[in-house]
Amino acid sequence: MSEPIEWLEDGTPYSPRFSDRYHSEHGGLEQARGTFLAGCGLPQAWQNQPQWRVLETGFGLGLNFLVTWAAWRADPHRPQRLHFVSCEAWPVSAADLLRAAPIDSTLQSLAQQLAAQYWGLLPGVHRLSFDGGQVLLTLYIGDAQALLRQQQPTADSVYLDGFDPQHNPQMWDIHTLKAVARCCRRGTRLATWTVARGVRDGLVQCGFEVQKVPGVRPKRDNLQATYAPRWEPRAGQPVLPDATVAAPARCLVVGAGLAGAAVAASLAHRGWQVQVLDRADHPAAGASGLPAGVFAPNVSQDDNLISRLSRAGVRITLNTLAQLPAETRGTDWSACGTLEHRVDGTTGLAWSDGPGLDWSRPATPAQLQANGLSADTVACWHEHAGWVRPPQLIAHLLNDPAIRWRGSAAVAELRRTTVDGQPLWQALDAEGHVLAEAELAVVCAGHHTGPLTHAHWPMNPLRGQLAWGLHAQAPAGAPWPPQPLNGNGNLVPRVPLQDGAGWVLGSTFERLKTALPPSPDDHAKGLATNQAKLHALLPPLGAAMDAAFSQAATAPDGPVRTWAAVRCGALDRRPIVGPVDSVRQPGLWLCTAMGARGLTLSLLCGELIAARLHSEPLPLDAPLARALSSERWLGYEPQ
């Protein structure tokens, strides 16, 4: 349930929890612009910068974010990317955000975009994306002090905001102020509306130079401060080892699947010149070339690490898909929702109410009926899920003027060298010819990754076989569901394929098998496995398709066809993302082992690499970032 708001007679939003107004009866717009934006020297301070990072201690109704976003849009000298990190322990509803937004047409438009993404705010970190990914809002849902200590973002400006210190003292106490100070660099400017003595003294104690300035009504005075400690702040243990680069340069990416395309796109958006190399003559030639796949959150009764990772990944996948041309919706992807048939008989949900229901909830009787499932079937409805055609998504990701694609370029070795005094990585073919060179190299080559990184990673090849077909050849009257199903396998019931509307079902998990095409015996086993999956997912459709499956072995172009590729998975079933060895092999990174979750996690992993290289706020909870990091296999243990 969202935080309740009362609306006073003068239209001011009021918090029953804190017995305080969200802003004065004069409105919050003047305060947002005068106290916070101008109080931090914005927009002048951010002009002509590659990025600017604003930290806010209380998101509230989002007005400070909207005003900052609008100012960024209006500034011709704005930074290339605006990061806005905001803490909020008690998020309100999207409807209340819209109701509280100023009448100003520009801010109303921005508020509507914000409200459209303001859902599913379970405790933790949520990355929202606007203006093609140039404006990134990272929400910390929960206790501000704890999350700031956990995430350790770097701030260029700080909006110290929240309910009155008398009503919400924890937000202003010395422990929270210390957590804020740890996020500041020398010169970071801070602004707030309160001049309470305890706040002033606390800021001074934390290393800020503080001054009173004329206030924005109804306040006589406001407070401004600059982080300028007279001591050298003690460096704590970072979330992950520092990997910040001085500036974007050149990057070579080995592998043109989902992981490679995601890394290339994320870095190109930050100003890198990227060359993508692949042994095949076209992108998405490996495991990412499947005709269609499902993206959906994982659910577990203890809301385990994979479940939390999957939600972070789905949100970024949705952000990316929403930025694609409008004509791709329904042809290359669809966020139509997914029904998960819980064949183990449990819902798997870690919640019965609250924001988790925005993500996943028990399926309704009407949904079960629409899918041809009996009323006693246990199933979940994933509202923010759907299907994607991976080759088309990869093509869109690589369609950037800063990305060059080169096929038929099998990389046999990556060599560290120096050219004109500049350390570089060179990609060599089997004859020793240089295919590409760059300051940064990222290996996204699936089960071929190990030899290229001169290291052994705990990964295994994992062959998968799909079944697919065209509706024109399917049995007449087959009871196809209205949307994808997942569970023990997944089914995309209707997707535009090259030869017409089709369906895709899969997939098998054949550990340590790499032969392509599969042997006749393995092919037959794969068909039987996928047929059994269909019976488990949707028994009526499984029965209707039995005859078609029986023809598959002797009619390769018949109603049921097959597709196979080799995926790569780590022993702990999580991607491996990060530097190979920052001391002995600086500038060599990897992003691999997506397993069966490439559509859910690849784009998140690309953003994680970009965040680490550019000292950006992490796009997910720090413990989850560590769970993905290559350092987990290299002995890094944060304190």
Swiss-Prot record:
InterPro entries with a match to the protein in the record: FAD-dep_OxRdtase, FAD/NAD-bd_sf, MnmC-like_methylTransf, SAM-dependent_MTases_sf, tRNA_MAMT_biosynth_bifunc_MnmC, tRNA_MNMC2, tRNA_S-uridine_synth_MnmC_C
Cofactor(s) listed: FAD
An individual GO BP term: tRNA wobble base modification
GO molecular function: flavin adenine dinucleotide binding; oxidoreductase activity, acting on the CH-NH group of donors; tRNA (5-methylaminomethyl-2-thiouridylate)(34)-methyltransferase activity
Annotated region (tRNA (mnm(5)s(2)U34)-methyltransferase), positions in chain: 1-228
Location of this chain's protein in the cell: Cytoplasm
GO CC annotation terms, alphabetical: cytoplasm
SUPFAM superfamilies: FAD/NAD(P)-binding domain (SSF51905)
Family label: In the N-terminal section; belongs to the methyltransferase superfamily. tRNA (mnm(5)s(2)U34)-methyltransferase family. In the C-terminal section; belongs to the DAO family.
Protein name listed in UniProt: tRNA 5-methylaminomethyl-2-thiouridine biosynthesis bifunctional protein MnmC
Organism, as annotated: Acidovorax sp. (strain JS42)
Native organism taxonomy: Bacteria, Pseudomonadati, Pseudomonadota, Betaproteobacteria, Burkholderiales
